[in-house]
Regions:
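A structural signal for short loop-to-beta-strand junctions that line the ligand-binding cleft
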Residues: 112-113, 121, 125, 149-190, ...
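Extracytoplasmic "Venus flytrap"/periplasmic binding protein-like
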Residues: 86-156, 169, 192-193, 297, ...
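Extracytoplasmic/periplasmic solute-binding protein
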Residues: 165-176, 181, 191, 208-260
Length: 471
Protein backbone atom coordinates (compact mmCIF):
# COMPACT_ATOMS: atom_id res chain seq x y z
CA UNK A 1 0.00 0.00 0.00
CA UNK A 2 2.91 2.35 0.65
CA UNK A 3 4.25 1.56 -2.80
CA UNK A 4 0.95 2.57 -4.35
CA UNK A 5 0.92 5.83 -2.46
CA UNK A 6 4.50 6.66 -3.24
CA UNK A 7 4.21 5.73 -6.90
CA UNK A 8 1.16 7.94 -7.16
CA UNK A 9 3.16 10.63 -5.47
CA UNK A 10 6.00 10.17 -7.90
CA UNK A 11 3.55 10.63 -10.74
CA UNK A 12 2.07 13.70 -9.11
CA UNK A 13 5.43 15.28 -8.59
CA UNK A 14 6.48 14.61 -12.15
CA UNK A 15 3.33 16.27 -13.38
CA UNK A 16 4.08 19.26 -11.22
CA UNK A 17 7.65 19.39 -12.44
CA UNK A 18 7.08 22.69 -14.15
CA UNK A 19 6.28 24.06 -10.74
CA UNK A 20 8.86 22.45 -8.57
CA UNK A 21 11.85 21.70 -10.68
CA UNK A 22 12.49 25.16 -11.82
CA UNK A 23 11.65 28.45 -10.36
CA UNK A 24 9.50 26.51 -7.95
CA UNK A 25 6.61 28.91 -7.71
CA UNK A 26 4.57 28.60 -10.86
CA UNK A 27 0.86 27.90 -10.80
CA UNK A 28 0.68 25.29 -13.51
CA UNK A 29 -2.51 23.28 -13.73
CA UNK A 30 -1.56 21.23 -16.77
CA UNK A 31 -1.28 17.46 -16.55
CA UNK A 32 0.59 14.94 -18.63
CA UNK A 33 -2.45 13.86 -20.62
CA UNK A 34 -4.20 17.13 -21.27
CA UNK A 35 -3.27 20.28 -23.08
CA UNK A 36 -4.81 23.62 -23.88
CA UNK A 37 -3.87 26.57 -25.98
CA UNK A 38 -4.08 29.96 -24.32
CA UNK A 39 -6.48 30.72 -21.52
CA UNK A 40 -9.78 32.48 -20.96
CA UNK A 41 -8.93 33.51 -17.41
CA UNK A 42 -8.80 37.28 -16.90
CA UNK A 43 -6.71 37.91 -13.81
CA UNK A 44 -6.52 41.70 -14.14
CA UNK A 45 -9.06 42.08 -11.35
CA UNK A 46 -7.21 39.67 -9.07
CA UNK A 47 -3.71 40.78 -9.98
CA UNK A 48 -3.51 44.12 -11.82
CA UNK A 49 0.05 44.96 -12.85
CA UNK A 50 1.31 48.33 -14.05
CA UNK A 51 4.78 48.85 -15.52
CA UNK A 52 4.22 52.26 -17.12
CA UNK A 53 6.76 54.08 -14.95
CA UNK A 54 9.52 51.50 -15.34
CA UNK A 55 12.45 51.90 -17.72
CA UNK A 56 14.77 48.99 -18.51
CA UNK A 57 17.55 48.11 -20.87
CA UNK A 58 16.50 44.62 -21.90
CA UNK A 59 18.03 44.82 -25.36
CA UNK A 60 17.79 46.83 -28.52
CA UNK A 61 14.48 47.38 -30.28
CA UNK A 62 13.04 44.43 -32.16
CA UNK A 63 10.35 43.96 -34.76
CA UNK A 64 6.95 43.44 -33.09
CA UNK A 65 5.90 39.80 -33.22
CA UNK A 66 3.66 37.18 -31.67
CA UNK A 67 5.91 34.62 -30.02
CA UNK A 68 4.85 31.04 -29.46
CA UNK A 69 5.53 29.47 -26.06
CA UNK A 70 5.36 25.75 -25.27
CA UNK A 71 5.32 24.83 -21.61
CA UNK A 72 3.46 24.12 -18.43
CA UNK A 73 1.85 27.40 -17.46
CA UNK A 74 0.59 30.71 -18.81
CA UNK A 75 3.65 32.95 -18.64
CA UNK A 76 1.54 36.00 -19.43
CA UNK A 77 -0.40 35.63 -16.17
CA UNK A 78 1.84 33.81 -13.65
CA UNK A 79 2.45 36.14 -10.72
CA UNK A 80 6.23 36.04 -10.89
CA UNK A 81 6.46 36.48 -14.68
CA UNK A 82 3.51 38.74 -15.49
CA UNK A 83 5.33 42.05 -14.78
CA UNK A 84 8.20 41.03 -17.09
CA UNK A 85 5.72 40.03 -19.78
CA UNK A 86 3.79 43.29 -19.49
CA UNK A 87 6.98 45.30 -19.83
CA UNK A 88 8.03 43.21 -22.84
CA UNK A 89 4.63 43.62 -24.45
CA UNK A 90 4.21 47.34 -23.82
CA UNK A 91 7.76 48.41 -24.67
CA UNK A 92 8.74 46.01 -27.44
CA UNK A 93 5.36 45.53 -29.08
CA UNK A 94 5.48 41.75 -28.75
CA UNK A 95 2.94 39.28 -27.44
CA UNK A 96 3.23 35.65 -26.42
CA UNK A 97 0.73 32.93 -27.23
CA UNK A 98 0.93 30.06 -24.77
CA UNK A 99 0.42 26.42 -25.63
CA UNK A 100 0.13 24.74 -22.26
CA UNK A 101 1.01 21.06 -21.95
CA UNK A 102 2.03 18.68 -19.20
CA UNK A 103 5.72 18.46 -18.45
CA UNK A 104 5.87 14.91 -19.78
CA UNK A 105 4.55 16.08 -23.15
CA UNK A 106 7.07 18.81 -23.85
CA UNK A 107 9.75 16.71 -25.56
CA UNK A 108 7.21 14.99 -27.82
CA UNK A 109 5.44 18.24 -28.73
CA UNK A 110 8.71 20.06 -29.31
CA UNK A 111 10.06 17.30 -31.55
CA UNK A 112 6.89 17.35 -33.65
CA UNK A 113 6.88 21.14 -33.92
CA UNK A 114 10.52 21.37 -35.01
CA UNK A 115 10.20 18.58 -37.59
CA UNK A 116 7.12 20.21 -39.12
CA UNK A 117 8.77 23.61 -39.40
CA UNK A 118 6.53 25.15 -36.74
CA UNK A 119 9.02 25.67 -33.93
CA UNK A 120 7.85 27.65 -30.92
CA UNK A 121 10.02 30.53 -29.77
CA UNK A 122 10.21 29.74 -26.06
CA UNK A 123 10.14 26.48 -24.12
CA UNK A 124 10.57 25.69 -20.43
CA UNK A 125 13.78 24.36 -18.95
CA UNK A 126 13.10 20.91 -17.47
CA UNK A 127 15.01 18.14 -15.72
CA UNK A 128 15.81 16.47 -19.05
CA UNK A 129 16.89 19.66 -20.85
CA UNK A 130 20.55 19.08 -20.05
CA UNK A 131 22.12 17.07 -21.46
CA UNK A 132 19.38 14.93 -23.07
CA UNK A 133 17.44 17.45 -25.17
CA UNK A 134 20.41 19.78 -25.63
CA UNK A 135 22.40 16.95 -27.18
CA UNK A 136 19.70 16.51 -29.84
CA UNK A 137 20.34 19.96 -31.37
CA UNK A 138 16.82 21.09 -30.54
CA UNK A 139 17.74 24.55 -29.23
CA UNK A 140 19.13 27.76 -30.72
CA UNK A 141 22.48 29.05 -29.38
CA UNK A 142 21.90 32.45 -27.77
CA UNK A 143 25.46 33.77 -27.68
CA UNK A 144 24.82 36.29 -30.48
CA UNK A 145 21.66 37.61 -28.83
CA UNK A 146 22.64 37.80 -25.16
CA UNK A 147 25.24 40.02 -23.50
CA UNK A 148 26.58 38.13 -20.52
CA UNK A 149 28.39 41.30 -19.40
CA UNK A 150 25.06 43.13 -18.94
CA UNK A 151 24.34 44.11 -15.30
CA UNK A 152 21.47 41.64 -14.88
CA UNK A 153 23.83 38.73 -15.52
CA UNK A 154 26.57 39.94 -13.18
CA UNK A 155 28.15 37.13 -11.17
CA UNK A 156 26.25 34.42 -13.04
CA UNK A 157 28.64 33.48 -15.83
CA UNK A 158 30.02 30.48 -13.94
CA UNK A 159 26.51 29.06 -13.57
CA UNK A 160 25.41 29.84 -17.11
CA UNK A 161 28.51 28.08 -18.39
CA UNK A 162 27.55 24.95 -16.45
CA UNK A 163 24.98 24.37 -19.19
CA UNK A 164 27.27 24.96 -22.16
CA UNK A 165 27.06 22.40 -24.91
CA UNK A 166 29.91 22.09 -27.38
CA UNK A 167 31.15 25.52 -26.43
CA UNK A 168 27.84 27.30 -26.99
CA UNK A 169 25.38 28.82 -24.53
CA UNK A 170 21.80 27.79 -25.16
CA UNK A 171 20.41 28.48 -21.70
CA UNK A 172 20.49 31.71 -19.71
CA UNK A 173 18.52 30.93 -16.54
CA UNK A 174 16.67 33.96 -15.23
CA UNK A 175 15.76 32.34 -11.89
CA UNK A 176 18.35 30.88 -9.53
CA UNK A 177 17.05 29.02 -6.52
CA UNK A 178 19.30 28.05 -3.67
CA UNK A 179 17.31 25.45 -1.74
CA UNK A 180 14.59 24.82 -4.34
CA UNK A 181 13.18 22.25 -1.91
CA UNK A 182 12.24 22.99 1.67
CA UNK A 183 11.10 21.18 4.78
CA UNK A 184 7.61 22.46 5.57
CA UNK A 185 6.33 22.09 9.13
CA UNK A 186 3.42 23.11 11.34
CA UNK A 187 5.03 25.74 13.53
CA UNK A 188 1.92 26.03 15.67
CA UNK A 189 2.04 22.33 16.55
CA UNK A 190 5.78 22.50 17.19
CA UNK A 191 5.14 25.28 19.68
CA UNK A 192 2.37 23.28 21.39
CA UNK A 193 4.67 20.28 21.75
CA UNK A 194 7.50 22.45 23.03
CA UNK A 195 9.94 21.75 20.20
CA UNK A 196 12.58 24.23 19.12
CA UNK A 197 11.50 26.16 16.03
CA UNK A 198 13.60 24.87 13.10
CA UNK A 199 13.66 28.38 11.61
CA UNK A 200 15.24 29.70 14.81
CA UNK A 201 17.73 26.83 14.79
CA UNK A 202 18.59 27.73 11.21
CA UNK A 203 19.03 31.41 12.08
CA UNK A 204 21.33 30.43 14.94
CA UNK A 205 23.46 28.17 12.73
CA UNK A 206 22.27 25.06 14.57
CA UNK A 207 20.16 23.41 11.85
CA UNK A 208 22.09 20.22 11.04
CA UNK A 209 21.41 16.59 10.20
CA UNK A 210 21.65 15.86 13.92
CA UNK A 211 19.22 18.54 15.10
CA UNK A 212 16.74 17.56 12.39
CA UNK A 213 16.93 13.93 13.48
CA UNK A 214 16.50 14.92 17.13
CA UNK A 215 13.52 17.11 16.23
CA UNK A 216 11.82 14.28 14.33
CA UNK A 217 12.36 11.84 17.20
CA UNK A 218 10.89 14.27 19.73
CA UNK A 219 7.95 15.00 17.44
CA UNK A 220 7.11 11.31 17.05
CA UNK A 221 7.62 10.57 20.76
CA UNK A 222 5.31 13.44 21.75
CA UNK A 223 2.28 11.35 20.75
CA UNK A 224 1.65 8.50 23.17
CA UNK A 225 -0.82 6.95 20.70
CA UNK A 226 1.86 6.53 18.08
CA UNK A 227 0.00 8.45 15.37
CA UNK A 228 2.76 10.89 14.53
CA UNK A 229 5.36 10.28 11.83
CA UNK A 230 8.52 12.05 10.74
CA UNK A 231 9.60 13.08 7.25
CA UNK A 232 7.72 12.50 4.00
CA UNK A 233 7.58 14.25 0.63
CA UNK A 234 9.16 14.26 -2.81
CA UNK A 235 11.23 11.12 -2.50
CA UNK A 236 14.18 11.53 -4.86
CA UNK A 237 14.42 15.32 -4.53
CA UNK A 238 14.48 15.07 -0.75
CA UNK A 239 17.24 12.49 -0.94
CA UNK A 240 19.18 14.59 -3.44
CA UNK A 241 18.98 17.66 -1.19
CA UNK A 242 20.52 15.69 1.68
CA UNK A 243 23.31 14.39 -0.55
CA UNK A 244 24.03 17.85 -1.96
CA UNK A 245 24.42 19.20 1.58
CA UNK A 246 27.76 17.36 1.68
CA UNK A 247 28.99 19.70 -1.05
CA UNK A 248 29.27 16.85 -3.55
CA UNK A 249 26.73 16.65 -6.40
CA UNK A 250 25.72 13.30 -7.84
CA UNK A 251 26.50 14.45 -11.39
CA UNK A 252 28.47 17.62 -12.00
CA UNK A 253 30.09 19.46 -14.88
CA UNK A 254 33.88 19.34 -14.81
CA UNK A 255 36.18 22.19 -15.78
CA UNK A 256 36.47 20.65 -19.25
CA UNK A 257 32.68 20.82 -19.68
CA UNK A 258 32.18 17.08 -19.38
CA UNK A 259 29.89 15.19 -17.01
CA UNK A 260 31.39 13.69 -13.87
CA UNK A 261 29.73 10.99 -11.74
CA UNK A 262 30.16 11.12 -7.97
CA UNK A 263 27.93 8.18 -7.09
CA UNK A 264 30.90 6.38 -5.52
CA UNK A 265 32.16 9.40 -3.59
CA UNK A 266 32.71 8.79 0.13
CA UNK A 267 30.62 11.83 1.10
CA UNK A 268 27.72 10.64 -1.02
CA UNK A 269 27.99 7.25 0.70
CA UNK A 270 27.93 8.96 4.09
CA UNK A 271 24.78 10.90 3.20
CA UNK A 272 23.15 7.73 1.89
CA UNK A 273 23.97 5.91 5.13
CA UNK A 274 22.42 8.77 7.09
CA UNK A 275 19.24 8.50 5.01
CA UNK A 276 19.11 4.74 5.49
CA UNK A 277 19.28 5.33 9.24
CA UNK A 278 16.30 7.68 9.02
CA UNK A 279 14.40 5.06 7.06
CA UNK A 280 15.36 2.10 9.24
CA UNK A 281 14.46 3.94 12.44
CA UNK A 282 11.06 4.94 11.06
CA UNK A 283 11.92 8.65 10.98
CA UNK A 284 11.28 8.93 7.23
CA UNK A 285 8.07 7.27 6.11
CA UNK A 286 4.73 7.79 4.43
CA UNK A 287 1.48 7.48 6.33
CA UNK A 288 -1.02 5.04 4.88
CA UNK A 289 -2.75 6.48 1.82
CA UNK A 290 -0.56 9.59 1.78
CA UNK A 291 1.40 10.71 -1.27
CA UNK A 292 4.19 13.24 -1.49
CA UNK A 293 2.05 16.28 -2.36
CA UNK A 294 -0.55 15.63 0.36
CA UNK A 295 -0.70 18.48 2.85
CA UNK A 296 -3.04 16.83 5.36
CA UNK A 297 -0.28 15.39 7.62
CA UNK A 298 1.24 18.85 8.05
CA UNK A 299 -2.11 20.60 8.44
CA UNK A 300 -3.25 18.10 11.07
CA UNK A 301 0.14 18.02 12.77
CA UNK A 302 0.64 14.28 12.31
CA UNK A 303 3.92 14.52 10.38
CA UNK A 304 6.99 16.51 11.34
CA UNK A 305 8.21 17.62 7.91
CA UNK A 306 7.17 17.55 4.27
CA UNK A 307 10.07 17.80 1.84
CA UNK A 308 8.64 19.59 -1.15
CA UNK A 309 9.30 22.25 -3.75
CA UNK A 310 8.82 25.93 -3.07
CA UNK A 311 5.61 25.90 -5.11
CA UNK A 312 3.64 24.14 -2.37
CA UNK A 313 4.27 26.90 0.19
CA UNK A 314 1.71 29.13 -1.50
CA UNK A 315 -1.01 26.60 -0.65
CA UNK A 316 -0.11 26.71 3.03
CA UNK A 317 0.00 30.52 2.89
CA UNK A 318 -3.52 30.64 1.47
CA UNK A 319 -4.76 28.46 4.34
CA UNK A 320 -3.16 30.84 6.84
CA UNK A 321 -4.84 33.80 5.17
CA UNK A 322 -8.23 32.17 5.73
CA UNK A 323 -7.48 31.22 9.35
CA UNK A 324 -5.05 33.42 11.28
CA UNK A 325 -4.69 30.79 14.02
CA UNK A 326 -2.66 28.62 11.65
CA UNK A 327 1.11 28.89 11.49
CA UNK A 328 3.07 26.96 8.86
CA UNK A 329 6.66 27.63 7.95
CA UNK A 330 9.66 26.05 6.25
CA UNK A 331 13.42 25.71 6.42
CA UNK A 332 16.06 24.55 3.94
CA UNK A 333 17.47 21.07 4.27
CA UNK A 334 19.93 20.89 7.17
CA UNK A 335 23.67 21.32 7.07
CA UNK A 336 25.94 18.30 6.96
CA UNK A 337 27.75 18.51 10.33
CA UNK A 338 30.94 17.11 8.79
CA UNK A 339 31.04 19.46 5.79
CA UNK A 340 33.33 22.48 5.78
CA UNK A 341 30.47 24.80 4.75
CA UNK A 342 26.68 24.90 4.65
CA UNK A 343 26.02 23.60 1.14
CA UNK A 344 22.66 23.95 -0.60
CA UNK A 345 21.17 22.33 -3.66
CA UNK A 346 20.67 24.87 -6.40
CA UNK A 347 18.22 24.76 -9.27
CA UNK A 348 17.68 27.14 -12.14
CA UNK A 349 14.74 28.02 -14.29
CA UNK A 350 14.30 29.84 -17.54
CA UNK A 351 13.40 29.45 -21.17
CA UNK A 352 15.27 28.12 -24.14
CA UNK A 353 14.73 29.07 -27.76
CA UNK A 354 13.98 26.00 -29.89
CA UNK A 355 15.84 25.36 -33.13
CA UNK A 356 13.99 26.88 -36.04
CA UNK A 357 12.48 29.74 -34.05
CA UNK A 358 11.69 32.76 -36.22
CA UNK A 359 11.95 35.16 -33.31
CA UNK A 360 15.07 34.23 -31.37
CA UNK A 361 16.03 37.89 -30.95
CA UNK A 362 12.63 38.81 -29.51
CA UNK A 363 12.70 35.74 -27.26
CA UNK A 364 16.09 36.79 -25.93
CA UNK A 365 14.74 40.23 -25.04
CA UNK A 366 11.93 38.55 -23.09
CA UNK A 367 14.45 36.40 -21.21
CA UNK A 368 16.31 39.58 -20.30
CA UNK A 369 13.06 41.11 -19.03
CA UNK A 370 12.48 38.07 -16.83
CA UNK A 371 15.98 38.30 -15.39
CA UNK A 372 15.55 42.03 -14.76
CA UNK A 373 12.47 41.25 -12.68
CA UNK A 374 14.98 39.83 -10.18
CA UNK A 375 17.58 42.60 -10.42
CA UNK A 376 16.01 45.94 -11.41
CA UNK A 377 14.77 47.73 -8.29
CA UNK A 378 11.53 49.04 -9.80
CA UNK A 379 10.53 45.91 -11.70
CA UNK A 380 11.50 43.77 -8.73
CA UNK A 381 9.15 45.77 -6.48
CA UNK A 382 6.33 45.40 -9.00
CA UNK A 383 7.04 41.68 -9.23
CA UNK A 384 6.93 41.36 -5.45
CA UNK A 385 3.47 42.94 -5.37
CA UNK A 386 2.33 40.59 -8.13
CA UNK A 387 3.68 37.54 -6.31
CA UNK A 388 2.16 38.57 -2.99
CA UNK A 389 -1.27 39.03 -4.58
CA UNK A 390 -1.17 35.70 -6.37
CA UNK A 391 0.69 33.56 -3.83
CA UNK A 392 -0.68 35.07 -0.59
CA UNK A 393 2.65 34.71 1.20
CA UNK A 394 3.11 36.36 4.56
CA UNK A 395 5.84 39.00 4.64
CA UNK A 396 8.00 36.60 6.65
CA UNK A 397 7.54 33.85 4.06
CA UNK A 398 8.31 36.13 1.14
CA UNK A 399 11.44 37.64 2.65
CA UNK A 400 12.80 34.24 3.63
CA UNK A 401 12.08 32.76 0.20
CA UNK A 402 13.63 35.69 -1.62
CA UNK A 403 16.78 35.43 0.49
CA UNK A 404 17.56 32.19 -1.36
CA UNK A 405 17.46 33.86 -4.79
CA UNK A 406 20.83 35.57 -4.38
CA UNK A 407 23.14 32.66 -5.01
CA UNK A 408 26.26 34.69 -4.33
CA UNK A 409 25.38 34.61 -0.62
CA UNK A 410 25.46 30.81 -0.45
CA UNK A 411 27.59 27.79 -1.21
CA UNK A 412 25.46 26.44 -4.04
CA UNK A 413 25.76 22.91 -5.45
CA UNK A 414 24.78 22.46 -9.10
CA UNK A 415 23.58 18.88 -9.51
CA UNK A 416 22.08 17.40 -12.69
CA UNK A 417 21.20 13.78 -11.92
CA UNK A 418 17.97 13.53 -13.96
CA UNK A 419 19.09 14.82 -17.35
CA UNK A 420 20.30 11.54 -18.83
CA UNK A 421 18.09 9.32 -20.96
CA UNK A 422 14.65 8.50 -19.57
CA UNK A 423 15.50 4.97 -18.41
CA UNK A 424 18.68 5.94 -16.58
CA UNK A 425 17.08 8.99 -15.02
CA UNK A 426 14.28 6.82 -13.65
CA UNK A 427 16.82 4.37 -12.22
CA UNK A 428 18.50 7.25 -10.38
CA UNK A 429 15.15 8.48 -9.07
CA UNK A 430 14.25 5.00 -7.84
CA UNK A 431 17.59 4.43 -6.14
CA UNK A 432 17.44 7.79 -4.35
CA UNK A 433 13.83 7.34 -3.31
CA UNK A 434 14.41 3.83 -1.99
CA UNK A 435 17.45 4.95 -0.02
CA UNK A 436 15.39 7.32 2.12
CA UNK A 437 11.94 5.69 2.06
CA UNK A 438 10.65 2.13 2.16
CA UNK A 439 8.87 2.03 -1.18
CA UNK A 440 8.50 -1.74 -1.49
CA UNK A 441 9.93 -1.78 -4.98
CA UNK A 442 10.30 -5.31 -6.28
CA UNK A 443 13.64 -4.38 -7.79
CA UNK A 444 15.11 -2.69 -4.72
CA UNK A 445 13.19 -4.06 -1.74
CA UNK A 446 15.50 -4.79 1.16
CA UNK A 447 18.61 -3.53 -0.64
CA UNK A 448 21.13 -1.12 0.79
CA UNK A 449 22.34 2.01 -0.94
CA UNK A 450 25.57 0.24 -1.84
CA UNK A 451 23.74 -2.69 -3.42
CA UNK A 452 21.41 -0.44 -5.43
CA UNK A 453 24.24 1.82 -6.54
CA UNK A 454 26.50 -1.02 -7.65
CA UNK A 455 23.67 -2.60 -9.62
CA UNK A 456 23.00 0.68 -11.42
CA UNK A 457 26.45 2.19 -11.77
CA UNK A 458 27.25 0.52 -15.08
CA UNK A 459 24.14 1.96 -16.71
CA UNK A 460 24.77 5.42 -15.29
CA UNK A 461 28.41 5.50 -16.33
CA UNK A 462 27.57 4.25 -19.82
CA UNK A 463 25.21 7.18 -20.34
CA UNK A 464 27.72 9.67 -19.01
CA UNK A 465 30.36 8.27 -21.37
CA UNK A 466 27.90 8.59 -24.25
CA UNK A 467 27.23 12.28 -23.63
CA UNK A 468 30.89 13.04 -22.99
CA UNK A 469 31.66 11.41 -26.33
CA UNK A 470 29.49 14.00 -28.05
CA UNK A 471 31.50 16.88 -26.63
Amino acid sequence: RILAGVMAGATAISLAACSNSGNGGFDSTATSDTSSTGTTIDDEKENPVSVGDISLNAGEDVEPAELQYLGCYDITKAGDVKPAYKYFSENYGCTIKCTIVGSLQILEKLTTAISSGESPDLVDYADNTFPLIMSKNMYTPLDEYMDISAPQWSGLEQYINKYKWNGKNYYYPWAYNVSPYFLIYNRGVFEQIGLDDPKELYDEGKWTWDTMTDTIRKFIDSDSDGNRTGLYGATEYTAQAIIDSTGVPLIEIGEDGKLVSNFSNANVDRAANFMQTLKNEGLASFQEGVIDVDTTPIKEGTAAFQGMGEWIISGYAKLMQKDDTLDYFFVPFPRDPEADQYYYSMSTFGYLVPAGSKYAKQASVFINCCRLSNTDEDLRATTKDSIMRSKKYTDEMYEFLMSFKDINNFHAVVDNPYGLDETTSQIIRDVLGNTLFEMYSEQYQGQTWTQMREASLGTINKQIEYYNGLL
